[in-house]
Regions:
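Conserved, single-site charged/polar hotspot
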Residues: 2-446, 604
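Solvent-exposed loop/turn segments at secondary-structure junctions
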Residues: 46-49, 79-80, 105, 232, ...
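Sec-exported extracytoplasmic/periplasmic mature domains
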Residues: 62-67, 74-81, 240-244, 264-275, ...
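Conserved SGNH/GDSL esterase-like catalytic core that processes O-acyl groups on lipids
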Residues: 449-455, 459-535, 560-566
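Active-site segments of SGNH/GDSL-like serine hydrolases
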Residues: 520-526, 540-569
């Protein structure tokens, strides 16, 4: 389990003239002192529900531990359950898929080969390039169908006749479209049925599906579009959406075993699906299994992207018919998720430590989120003023005792208990395995800190919610100024026409009443490293002219090799050496561990976890400076 976040220490670089040795960071305030939490930090593990197969776990088992796909499946679904791998009696059975983006819409289709036909058409010799089915106005379950030899996706408001489409007739219950090749497993992806998705912006995406695309109504007589495909053809559109096809090339091809295991899990799960009686067995979103079809065009005439992959096609073909059965012979509903954080959730399948998931070390194997008390209370206003957030975990092992069973949100007006899954949903957490740590203000004996100014760029702008949850409880008087592309000094900026006002401009715009006691400058990524020393000097001079007691710079991560941020950091360190009222917070060192790569989206900007961790770093550093008396009014007394 992680230690209390406020107690985690990082390096602070400060001018030698003001360095005070031997002082530890400030003790965090506690509930016993009568303080209420200003925020809550949620530490968690994994991405998804954690039941059954972990996709990243499969990848780790295959590429690091050298396991076969059979071993992977036996680990996640076998063992104490007595489940085993088996063969389907009907491996070519049909899957029917509700295509959710088409809800209440017409069904328009295109054929690259000009061979589209309607299965209900009495004249099966007719072929078209484009067709559209619309429910007849004033009638239920009666479809009017038009066809054209032009390549076109009609909008809902378009007149088919005015667009050159000819009416084929009216058809009861369904309108089902195929091309000459769409039901052939060997067909190229673009020889299948192209479905015109609803207009987004100015474009109609066209998504291609194997098998049949059908217009029909659900039990409430609402328009729906369904794809009917052979099971393995359907899986060719599922497996690459659930696990990256590129995994198959990893570790000299050993990653194929992760894809094979995924194919079997997806197949067994599919066979158990029967969600929408009279309509479809399954859906195309993560509520069921993500299904992308065979190919995609971003507009009707745009260059296509084939969504199927040779690796995942191979994984499906090489495991065809294989599913998981119970000892009694029933097909197992083989749930799976992205990452279990190093331990399966238990339930239908035993709770197991997952060395494969730990080895894969996915970006969401561990994660951090931060929420202010106001954000928590906004979800549960009946509790009044927040006093605590506590979790009850399953006790089956791992951080915080295991997966979260329920969460109690307590306040001055009462408390609310919700399930771990419900809390996860309310706050968009990656998984239901987490623990909650309160964030309090400064200890009551801490020195008073005057008004503060924060000047930041897009990094600073991105942490505004986390700042309110983690920093503001202890430092409430902060003038927070952060915008994209901001630099220290505009004229020497990489993009001088953007990010205005620059740091100098922000400082110069302050009225006398706004002059801060402490200034935090989180800038530099947009500055030219070659002029950084001069830029920093100008900012220091501007702040000194306004009698700022302590000037704090945050140095830069050097992960991005395309810029010489080490030179920028050297300029900041030199400024701290020569200016006794300047401190530099060493974010570069604090974020340099390989495991911290999950904090960055592009080696500069931060992921959601990175935003929480960066803000926590700032809070810890400010607390350390406060303990040393460097941001309180009388540092000489320390």
């Amino acid at each position: 389990m992680r230690i209390s976040p406020i107690k985690r220490c990082f390096v602070v670089l400060i001018g030698l003239a003001t360095f005070v040795a031997g002082l530890s960071p400030a003790r965090p305030a506690s509930a016993e002192e009568g303080q209420l939490p200003g925020g809550v930090i949620i530490y968690g593990r994994g991405f998804g529900h954690g039941r059954g197969l972990s996709q990243y776990g499969s990848y780790g088992w295959a590429t690091v531990h050298g396991w076969s796909w059979e071993q992977i499946l036996d680990f996640y679904y076998g063992g104490a359950t007595g489940n085993s791998r088996s063969m389907l009696e009907a491996p070519n059975q049909e899957m029917t898929v509700w295509l959710s983006v088409m809800n209440t819409k017409q069904t328009g289709v295109v054929s690259d080969s000009g061979t589209m036909r309607l299965l209900e058409d009495p004249d099966q010799g007719r072929r078209f390039t484009s067709m559209v089915a619309r429910e007849k106005s004033g009638a239920q379950r009666v479809y009017q169908v038009w066809g054209s030899n032009q390549r076109k996706c009609l909008n809902e408001s378009d007149s088919p006749e005015a667009a050159g489409f000819a009416l084929l007739g009216e058809f009861n219950e369904t309108a089902s479209f195929v091309t000459n090749a769409s039901q052939d497993p060997a067909a190229a992806a673009l020889d299948t049925v192209g479905l015109c998705e609803p207009k987004s912006s100015s474009l109609n995406q066209v998504r291609y599906y194997r098998g049949i695309v059908r217009a029909m109504n659900n039990s409430k007589n609402e328009n729906r579009t369904i794809n009917i495909a052979r099971l393995d053809d359907y899986l060719r559109g599922v497996v690459p959406r659930e696990s990256p096809a590129s995994w198959g090339d990893a570790a000299g091809g050993a990653g194929m075993n992760a894809l094979r295991a995924q194919a079997v899990a997806a197949r067994s799960y599919s066979v158990t699906e029967n969600r929408y009686a009279g309509l479809a067995k399954t859906c195309d979103t993560q509520d069921c299994q993500v299904y992308g079809g065979a190919a995609l065009r971003t507009s009707v005439n745009a260059s296509p992207s084939v969504l199927e992959s040779a690796n995942t096609d191979r994984a499906v073909a090489e495991t065809t018919g294989v599913i998981i059965r119970t000892p009694q012979g029933a097909v197992v509903r083989t749930e799976f998720s992205s990452s279990n954080g190093g331990r399966t959730a238990g339930g239908t399948f035993p709770a197991l430590v997952d060395a494969g998931d730990l080895s894969a070390d996915s970006s969401l194997m561990v994660w951090t989120r931060a929420f202010s008390a106001a954000q928590i209370v906004a979800k549960y206003p009946q509790v009044g003023i927040l006093t605590a957030v506590t979790t009850t975990n399953d006790g089956l092992g791992g951080d915080w005792g295991g997966y979260t069973l329920d969460v109690t949100i307590s306040g001055t007006a009462g408390s609310v208990k919700v399930s771990g899954w419900s809390f996860r949903t309310s706050f968009a957490l990656p998984a239901p395995w987490f623990g909650a740590t309160p964030v309090f203000g400064a200890p009551l004996e801490s020195g008073v800190v005057g008004s503060m100014l924060f000047v930041g760029d897009s990094i600073g702008q991105s942490i505004a919610p986390e700042f309110a949850a983690i920093v503001a409880p202890a430092y409430p008087s902060i003038n927070f100024q952060a915008i994209n592309n901001r630099c220290m000094v505009g004229p020497s900026c990489v993009t001088p026409d953007k990010g205005q006002p620059d740091a100098i401009g922000v400082v110069n715009s302050l009225s006398a009443e706004q002059f801060p006691s402490v200034a935090i400058v989180q800038l530099g990524y947009n500055d030219d490293p070659n002029t950084m020393a001069s830029d920093v000097t100008q900012v220091i001079n501007a702040l000194n002219a306004r009698n700022v007691q302590r000037i704090i710079f945050v140095n830069l991560s050097t992960r991005r090799a395309s810029q010489n941020y080490a030179l920028s950091n050297a300029a900041l360190a030199a400024a701290a050496q020569t200016n006794p009222n300047v401190s530099v917070l060493d974010w570069n060192a604090a974020s340099s561990a390989p495991s911290a790569s999950r904090w960055f989206s592009d080696d500069v900007h931060l992921t959601t976890t990175g935003r929480a961790e960066f803000t926590l770093f700032l809070r810890n550093q400010l607390d350390s400076l406060r303990a040393q008396g460097l941001i309180t009014p009388n540092p000489e007394s320390v």
